[in-house]
Amino acid sequence: GTPCDCYGYTGVYWFMLSRCPSGYGYNLSCHYFMGICCVKR
């Protein structure tokens, strides 16, 4: 995925998803236009 910024963390941008996929250990997310940024901090 594309890197993205979320509260100062670098995350992964998931296109067309409204919530982060499970099983990756994500515990922080930021909503973006047409997708979501998911961060494992």
Curated annotation (Swiss-Prot):
Coarsely, its chief localization is: secreted
GO cellular component terms given for this protein: extracellular region; nematocyst
Record's SUPFAM superfamilies?
Answer: Defensin-like
- What are the entry keywords? Acetylcholine receptor inhibiting toxin, Disulfide bond, Ion channel impairing toxin, Nematocyst, Neurotoxin, Postsynaptic neurotoxin, Proton-gated sodium channel impairing toxin, Secreted, Toxin
For the keyword Cell division, the answer is no
Spell out the InterPro entries in the cross-references: BDS_K_chnl_tox, Myo_ane_neurotoxin_sf
Source domain of life: Eukaryota
Name under which the protein is recorded: Pi-stichotoxin-Hcr5d
Q: Which organism is it from?
A: Radianthus crispa (Leathery sea anemone)
